[in-house]
């Protein structure tokens, strides 16, 4: 067969200009040119390489050029190193792609290791390449390999408890690349490494070969692995049928990694490897014999990217190579080459960014170890040996009527986990065969002695059996009587009068206590409002001194049938740390309710929707672990399934342990909401598609539906964005439920941010909400899966609890600090508002709860002012203009009086009243403080601008008087600090008898100002005052220039 050496040269350009000193990136491909029986033949892989180059061209500013140099050769370990040397000497490639054949790959890999040149292949499956010694240190296998098949087989043996023996049969002509030998080699080494007795034999393609094979099987093992052509398997099975080796004592694993036996052929239909061009009797014998056969194949990637890639691959193969390829598992190898090229480009780019060079092949290869990324073939995980983790499928005759083979299990190499589809394997005897049954291989065991028993031994044996049967029968009868007694006693029953509530409305079913997480916790149920918001309620009460949760049942009465009694008994029997304890039930109409353990921390839904609670991933994994443990126990209990699992049915107790509630008691369940209500559809967001269709399901189906609900809860915990979060879509619960129920491809599922979440967690979510229930894992598998990627899961229960409590305490401290700061800020605002209404000293007295007594002041100075012509101005202005005018004026005044030792008493309309000398006495400074303030206000008015009448001058009239007053707080609602006395009236008369833009002062004020000798006053004369007679008054003109004043 031809072995072309193809060179793909990629010239990297940055913005169309090559950097100085840069050179082309050379990729040398060494693969068979014409033999399509190889999955790595160039016509199969070439289109994938071209697609990879195009993908790199779209992602990077590169100029792609293909240069080929074809040399004739064979898939030979002798010619391959010669070709490798030629490529190195004449082209100096940066990466070798291939070979896929084992022997050529071994030779070329040794040279590549010496040159420190990366060698990337999706073939070379042999186990010897896994030991990355000095010979193969630059080899990277991005495709399947035999050791990974061995890992899968070892896990199968562990699952079926096969720990002793196995037999291997394979074809090895030694004239080709020995594909069957290298495939089964991985199984042999893995089983031998697990301390099993493993025997192997080459199948002889000659007369008597089938008889030799069955003789080898009888002598060496009940678990048989066969690797060879389908015709070889048919021959062995026909002979096994003749010798009665297909009676269920043996199982035959057929290693058909590319699934050729399951494809349709000239003489067989798809999925029926037993069909062949034989006689009717032989065909029937083969069909019966194949019931004992399990087929192992690679797993075709289920992601839509691979399907699209395969379609493009077939088109390019036809257009570029003139080859018609069919969809098959062989195309997986092309996809692995595609992902390998993109992996190399990604690592090379990182290496250069870190200061490395493309010539540093060892560094590039080391950076590929342990890498995880998503390619067209799904999740690509490289192990520490730079071998890709491989997925496999186990096929069994799932339909005994048609004889069709169907997937029984999927193996994930990345997770080291087997996912059983739920389709039972049709074991002939109903159970898997034993790998080392007694007296089958070890005849030296004394128990295998078949010497007949004596008459006395037979009598003794019969008597013993009779006594045993009598004892068992007595025990069963006693157990039956005790069961009936327990059912009749109704230990679960609670009288309504035994329940105590916090209020007297015992019969009021709507009396729920609204709870908050930071105080007492909240409910187990959620109600959706018309606006889509959740309101959480819990009905709680006391039973025998303990707080309990009470769930009312929307039924008029409960018939105590035998089924209902058994349901209640089972609820009492089921006790587990992660299930809420069932206390009892009240069936007294109309107060029918279920009483369970109360968990004060609230529901999981409450916690996730409370943004003030910080949940790190340790805490989240703890909650997930608790949920998985509870569901695993529930599924293995007599209750078997939940049926309504959702985050509101998961509650957290005082020790931060998550518990599952609202399980069991199917006879008590009823739907209170209308069929088309918003709340009803909101509760169905966690419901599996098969339940939404309304078809009744068996118990196993309900368990798979619980797994779907768990997947939705996982998404809630991961994103904390509510159930069934959809990025960029605003759909009602009804629309979401309808889309899920329709089941159209692509299946409608919540949004996932893969960049922010653990890839394994995302994979678990997707498997949990798979459309086909058989593809969903059970909770036992989920428990093992989470244990592997939860790094904190190994801590003790006490450590975990302490960590949870510490985190919760930190959250509470942070919450208290935030609330305290908010309280202090609001207190400051309230006090500031109070100080604006009342004097500071008076406000402090009121804050201390003291009574403010009226106080007399011997001498204070009072200021009054108003606007001349304000009535006429108001009549010519709108109310809003008047308000704006007064607001602007008094804002200006308030800013000015802050500079003086004065207290603003009040404003009424255009009147403005200020006093100095109270409530804090200031000696004789009250008169000059008011005088200076009045001068400042008069000066400000001269430049004040009226918005709606900018050309008008505002004319202020001011009156000032000094004398004794009495002051105190008046009223309870809107209390005011008021002044009383003749001095107030006199000051008002001084203002009303004054003149515009002048300050009118009394003689007492003039005398107080004269003591300072710095104020300029002018005698006005005697003025007639209403109620006062004639009073001598003065005009305050200003303050003389001096050290402390201005004129």
Swiss-Prot record:
Residues 861-991 form the Guanylate cyclase domain. The modification Phosphothreonine is found at residues 516, 529. Its EC number is 4.6.1.2. Residues 1-16 form the signal peptide. The keyword Transmembrane helix applies. It holds the Pfam family ANF_receptor. It is an enzyme of class 4 (lyase). Disulfide bonds join 75-101. The chain crosses the membrane at residues 459-478. The keyword DNA damage does not apply. Phosphorylated. Phosphorylation of the protein kinase-like domain is required for full activation by CNP. Glycosylated. The modification Phosphoserine is found at residues 513, 518, 522-523, 526. It comes from the Eukaryota. Receptor for the C-type natriuretic peptide NPPC/CNP hormone. Has guanylate cyclase activity upon binding of its ligand. May play a role in the regulation of skeletal growth. PANTHER family: ATRIAL NATRIURETIC PEPTIDE RECEPTOR 2, GUANYLYL CYCLASE. This is Atrial natriuretic peptide receptor 2. It comes from Bos taurus.
């Amino acid at each position: 067969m031809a072995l072309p050496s193809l060179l793909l040269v990629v010239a990297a350009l940055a913005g169309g200009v090559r950097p100085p000193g840069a050179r082309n990136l050379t990729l040398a491909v060494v693969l068979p040119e014409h033999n399509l029986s190889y999955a790595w033949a160039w016509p199969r892989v070439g289109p994938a390489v071209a697609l990879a180059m195009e993908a790199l061209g779209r992602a990077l500013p590169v100029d792609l050029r293909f240069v080929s140099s074809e040399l004739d050769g064979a898939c030979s370990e002798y010619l391959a190193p010669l070709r490798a040397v030629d490529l190195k000497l004449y082209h100096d490639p940066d990466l070798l792609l291939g070979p896929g054949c084992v022997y050529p790959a071994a030779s070329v890999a040794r040279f590549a290791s010496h040159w420190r040149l990366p060698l990337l292949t999706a073939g070379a499956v042999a186990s010897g390449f896994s030991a990355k010694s000095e010979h193969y240190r630059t080899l990277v296998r991005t495709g399947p390999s035999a050791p990974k098949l061995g890992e899968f087989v070892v896990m199968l043996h562990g699952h079926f408890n096969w720990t002793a023996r196995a037999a291997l049969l394979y074809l090895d002509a030694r004239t080709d690349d020995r594909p069957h030998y290298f495939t089964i080699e991985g199984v042999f080494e893995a089983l031998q490494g697990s301390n099993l007795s493993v025997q192997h034999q080459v199948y002889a393609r000659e007369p008597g070969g089938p008889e030799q094979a069955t003789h080898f099987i009888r002598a060496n093992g009940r678990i048989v692995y066969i690797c060879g052509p389908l015709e070889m398997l048919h021959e062995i099975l026909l002979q096994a049928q003749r010798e009665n080796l297909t009676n269920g004592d043996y199982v035959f694993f057929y290693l058909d990694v590319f699934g050729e036996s399951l494809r349709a052929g000239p003489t067989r239909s798809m999925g029926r490897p037993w069909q062949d061009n034989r006689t009717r009797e032989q065909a029937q014998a083969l069909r019966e014999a194949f019931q004992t056969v399990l087929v192992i194949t690679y797993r075709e990637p289920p992601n839509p990217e691979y399907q699209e890639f395969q379609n493009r691959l077939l088109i390019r193969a036809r257009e570029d190579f003139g080859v018609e390829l069919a969809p098959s598992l062989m195309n997986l190898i092309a996809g692995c080459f595609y992902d390998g090229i993109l992996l190399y480009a990604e690592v090379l780019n990182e290496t250069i960014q870190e200061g490395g060079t493309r010539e540093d092949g060892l560094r590039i290869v080391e950076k590929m170890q342990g890498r995880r990324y998503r390619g067209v073939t799904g999740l690509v995980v490289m192990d520490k040996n730079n071998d890709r983790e491989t997925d496999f499928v186990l096929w069994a005759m799932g339909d005994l009527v048609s004889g069709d083979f169907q997937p029984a299990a999927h193996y994930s190499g990345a997770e080291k986990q087997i996912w059983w589809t739920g389709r039972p394997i049709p074991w002939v005897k109903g159970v898997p065969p034993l790998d080392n049954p007694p007296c089958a291989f070890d005849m030296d065991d004394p128990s295998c002695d078949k010497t007949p028993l004596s008459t006395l031994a037979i009598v003794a044996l019969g008597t013993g059996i009779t006594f045993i049967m009598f004892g068992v029968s007595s025990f069963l009868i006693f157990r039956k009587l005790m069961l009936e007694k327990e059912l009749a006693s109704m230990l679960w029953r609670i009288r309504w009068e035994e329940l105590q509530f916090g209020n007297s409305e015992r019969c009021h079913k709507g009396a729920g206590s609204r709870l908050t997480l930071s105080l007492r916790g909240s409910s187990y149920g959620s109600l959706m409002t018309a606006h889509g918001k959740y309101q959480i309620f819990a009905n709680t009460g006391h039973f025998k001194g303990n707080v309990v949760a009470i769930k009312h049942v929307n039924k008029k009465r409960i018939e105590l049938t035998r089924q209902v009694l058994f349901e209640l008994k089972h609820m009492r029997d089921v006790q587990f740390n992660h299930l809420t304890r069932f206390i009892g039930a009240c069936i007294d109409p109309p107060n029918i309710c279920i009483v369970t353990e109360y968990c004060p921390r609230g529901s999981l839904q409450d916690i996730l929707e409370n943004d003030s609670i910080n949940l790190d991933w340790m805490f989240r994994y703890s909650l997930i672990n608790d949920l998985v443990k509870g569901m695993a126990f529930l599924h293995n209990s007599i209750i078997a399934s939940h049926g309504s699992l959702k985050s509101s049915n998961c509650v957290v107790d005082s020790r931060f342990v998550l518990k599952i509630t609202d399980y069991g008691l199917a006879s008590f369940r009823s739907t209170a909401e209308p069929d088309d209500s918003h709340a009803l559809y909101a509760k169905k967001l966690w419901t599996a598609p098969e339940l939404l269709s309304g078809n009744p399901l068996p118990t196993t189906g309900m368990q798979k539906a619980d797994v779907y609900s768990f997947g939705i809860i996982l998404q809630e915990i991961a994103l904390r964005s509510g159930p069934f979060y959809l990025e960029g879509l605003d759909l009602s619960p009804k629309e979401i439920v309808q889309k899920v129920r329709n089941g159209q491809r692509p299946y409608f599922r919540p949004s996932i941010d893969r960049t922010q979440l653990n890839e394994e967690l995302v994979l678990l979510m997707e498997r949990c909400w798979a459309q086909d229930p058989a593809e969903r894992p059970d909770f036992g598998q989920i428990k093992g899966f989470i244990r592997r990627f939860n790094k904190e899961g190994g801590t003790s229960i006490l450590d975990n609890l302490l960590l949870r409590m510490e985190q919760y305490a930190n959250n509470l401290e942070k919450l208290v600090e935030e609330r305290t700061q908010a309280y202090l800020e609001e207190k400051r605002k309230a006090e500031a508002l109070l100080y604006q209404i009342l004097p500071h000293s008076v406000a402090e007295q009121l804050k201390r709860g003291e009574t403010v007594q009226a106080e007399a002041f011997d001498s204070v100075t009072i200021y009054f002012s108003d606007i001349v012509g304000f009535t006429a101005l108001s009549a010519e202005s709108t109310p809003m203009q008047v308000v704006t005018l007064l607001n602007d004026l008094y804002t200006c005044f308030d800013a000015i009086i802050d500079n003086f030792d004065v207290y603003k008493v009040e404003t009424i309309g255009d009147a403005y009243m200020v006093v100095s000398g109270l409530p804090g006495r200031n000696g004789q400074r009250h008169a000059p403080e008011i005088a200076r303030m009045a001068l400042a206000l008069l000066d400000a008015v001269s430049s004040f601008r009226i918005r709606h009448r900018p050309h008008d001058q505002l004319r202020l009239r001011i009156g000032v008087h000094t004398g004794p007053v009495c002051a105190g707080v008046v009223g309870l609602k809107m209390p005011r600090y008021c002044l009383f006395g003749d001095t107030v009236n006199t000051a008002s008369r001084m203002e009303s008898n004054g003149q515009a833009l002048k300050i009118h002062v009394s003689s007492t004020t003039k005398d107080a100002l004269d003591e300072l000798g710095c104020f300029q006053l002018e005698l006005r004369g005697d003025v007639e005052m209403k109620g006062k007679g004639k009073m001598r008054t003065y005009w305050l003109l200003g303050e003389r220039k001096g050290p402390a004043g201005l004129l």
